[in-house]
Amino acid sequence: GEAGYADAAGMAQKVYDFEDTIARTVSWDRATRRNRDLTYTALTHAQVDELANGFPLETMLQKMGLGQTDRFIVSDIPPSAERAAELGLDEATLAKIGGGTPAMTTLIMNTPVEVLQAWTTKEMLENNAAILPKRFDDADFAFYGTLLQGTPEQRPRWKRSIAATEGMLGELVGKSYVERYFPAENKAAMIDLVSNLRKALAESIDEIDWMSDATKREAMAKLDSFDPKIGYRDNLETYPDLAITAGNPVANSMAAAEWGWQDMVSKLGQPIDRTEWFMLPQTVNAYYNSTKNEIVFPAAILQQPFFGISADDAVNYGGIGAVIGHEMGHGFDDQGSKSDATGMLRNWWTDADRQAFDKLGNA
């Protein structure tokens, strides 16, 4: 095969079997991964080392620039029997929890190195298919796009090119977008919309008949602390240290990935940057982030048909207003409600109120 394997089909089967084992014995199902009580496990460096099961974890951490890190959050550690009882997990839920990180390190140590190398090769080809020769991109789309998702054909090449550029230089593209499509008056109008919907939600919380005054006070404090971010962040990244070479998209992609990783590692041990966004200005979407208690509305969703500066109020409330209410609601849904006004994972509900909430949610 093109990757240099004499028996490409045979090696492909071994890689398939490796990934099948990951899916069956390591991975957690998506519903279980939503449970923040299960996926937030703070460990010391020494405790992380205990998960290695012979895997050269310390070498990997050093290579990643994490050798001096003294605290880690590991998202897929199966709960102990005591922790499972504390969380009230039933047998059906426990059955959906895979072996996680400990199982993965054990699997790697028990897998022949040539299979791991082939798997890594497959991952590299798959992740870079869009910028490799057309036959790789076509094969990747035929499987992931058509076979798995039923999409009959690729997007036009120019759209894929924009997506690739956004993946590497997203905020620089965003800077051009907001200069052209997001005037200052749009932000001012959105601030008013958010303020009015915040008042409406406060009235709704106040009228809840099953919630105690103590929990309502916490809920109101959280609502008052919502940090609305509108349009774009003030200091969009310009990537001054990222070298881009014309005619070499693979090298550019690798350089961008390295830049992104180093940028992330540089933030370790630093105060949380509350100006940072997790979406680009040109993304037609919005989100609520429980760890910062923020609601974020990129510039691209603040366009017709969701929002128009000259549109009737009814149109804007029916469009972007519904989106604002939706994102605010995430602050009080089954997972968002586990964080307090500061974004800390803290139970601010009385036991009776939490039970009533869960009962209504499961009705």
Per-segment meaning from a language model:
Residues 27, 235, 307-310, 332-336, ...:
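Short, solvent-exposed loop/turn and secondary-structure capping segments
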Residues 1-192, 196:
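Noncatalytic, helix-rich "gating/capping" subdomain that lines the substrate-entry/channel surface
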